């Protein structure tokens, strides 16, 4: 089936056979897979004007298509002819997978195509290769006469055999009936143990005879009656071609089992001719050995010697017993001539195998050289075609350039003529245009005059009409503006009213807010003022009390001083009068408080004092050198002495039978007031008095040195000796003693009004048990500087201080922590939020928050608004008296 390519005019361009493809540099034609129309693909370099053809809707130049297709077709046909001629002259190589018969036929044609000199050269090369290999193998053999004669015999034998072999080949080549060259057999003869090389000892003759007998083949006349041994080869395939297995020089009537010799040759060929050379060496050794035996046998007895006859040696050889027994059973034996003939035939087959390889190699080289020459020729032809094509293309380009130049000249001439015609035409058109312009101007002037007249009339009418329209428009605009002004006025009034209402509402809200804040501020100020006023009144009262107490104390000290001087004079007089009286007895002098005084003023408090209070005899302290005291401590000692003199009744009153028992409460109050007056100078005027909530429990470690007698009935006063540690006194004498430096109590004050103990200013409350043991020296375990004296607490810090609640006026010793106040404020705000007590912005009154937060305080202590503000700073938004937690609940 063919397809054709046609041009537009229906002319057939080229035929395409089925599955045929033509390719050139510019065009490629091939069959489509399932399309009935021809397909083509072209890479078009240029497109010129001319006759076109359409192939699959692609415009192509007919000349280029035809040229490209014809060129591709010519190359394809030439390549096909060349391939056919090569196949006819030289059949395909063996590597192409041909059958053995085709392979032999190919080698046969090649051999016949060679000249006589080429054939002789191939045979000579083979002979030289065998001789060179034999020389290389015998290079290291011994140099004895036997080995020398053996080498010479081998060379002579090879010369003879190759000469005869070439004659046979030449005769076969010149004969009319050309038999096929022998090819390798499919079977291989197991002859690895038949031939052995190297220098042999005395058994060389027997081994060579054995090898010769094994390689010998009976003639055709005896082939049917004498079978070959089993170990000499394999049977040929019954289906094989007998002609393929015939070597050169064989007759058609020969036995088919002669292929075993071919197997021997194949085996020799696979070993690169090594075993063949060994076989030749054995033959030469055998010949030399026979010659020596003949020479030795002539002296002993006449023996009939036949060349290459070694039947007796074969029969005596133990290794060849099986082969000899088979031939002895048949009753036939081979002569020496037959063995030599069989050896020559074996060599011919072996040489044919090796020569066939040489011929095959030469055939391959010849084919390769021919193909290379053909390729070079095709390359040269291609280059020639390319050069011709380039020349044609150059000529075509030159023609195109010349054509373009001619066309350009024609176009320039046409342009020049067109320009001249255009100038002439433009000139005529300009004259005609000028005439028409003048005519048009004249007509235009006439039209303008008429138009001006009409325009003046129309303008008058238009002006009157416009004035009327303007009047109507002004009236209409005035009405519209009046309506707009009226509407704007109403809107302005409404807006002003709305703004005024909003402003009033905002003002009312602001006023209410300001009033509320002002009320809260006034309330807070009132509370703060009340607090400040209360503090001021309390301070004034305390100042007055302190001033009054100071005046009274001054008067009291003056009076006591006078009384003391009197008492000293009286004591001195009594001491001189009663030197022999024991110290434990009462003094003879008596001091009686006047009955007109109901009590002694201590600290501004009037307390009743008994008129005649019996005083127990005072035990005198042992006369010991007293340490020097600092001025501060001396003042306290003087005050204690004044108190002792004041509380000690007059000696004259001891004899009075009337006994007055003072009230415990009044005596305790007097003692407290006296204690305050004694401690206040050391504390300074800025120290606030203890609040009403501060308990007065065991004020210790503050006692100045000195003993104070107890107020009670006679016989109930216990004397306590004063023991002052010398080291402690030295420590105190280094500087003024402050209340914080007095560390250890010297004694306790007893229950005022009852039987008490002698001691220093110490406990005001009655002790649980009276002091009955003597006062021990003060301990120096803790230094004075480590303790702080606090007269308002039960003890100073570092020993046994305990936090006690204070009052709001003088501050609290246990303030509420800030986190407790904040948490209580958050809980209170949440409660007020649930109750709806907050405004629209989430603020709540600080006073209400403070009152509610008092319930949520975990410590149970109260706090003020200022403490609430201080604790909630940063957690609450505080605006005036309003508070709100940041971030909400």
From Swiss-Prot:
Keywords: Coiled coil, Cytoplasm, Stress response. Residues 380-396, 409-577 have a biased composition (Basic and acidic residues). Residues 236-255, 295-320 have a biased composition (Acidic residues). Pfam families: NST1. InterPro entries: NST1 (IPR025279). Its main location: cytoplasm. Residues 31-51, 197-255, 291-339, 380-610, 648-701 are annotated as: Disordered. The keyword GTP-binding does not apply. Residues 39-49, 397-408 have a biased composition (Basic residues). Residues 201-215, 593-604, 663-672 have a biased composition (Polar residues). Residues 363-581 form a coiled coil. It is found in: Cytoplasm. Residues 218-229 have a biased composition (Low complexity). The keyword Membrane does not apply. It comes from the Eukaryota. GO terms for cellular component: cytoplasm. Belongs to the NST1 family. May act as a negative regulator of salt tolerance. This is Stress response protein NST1.
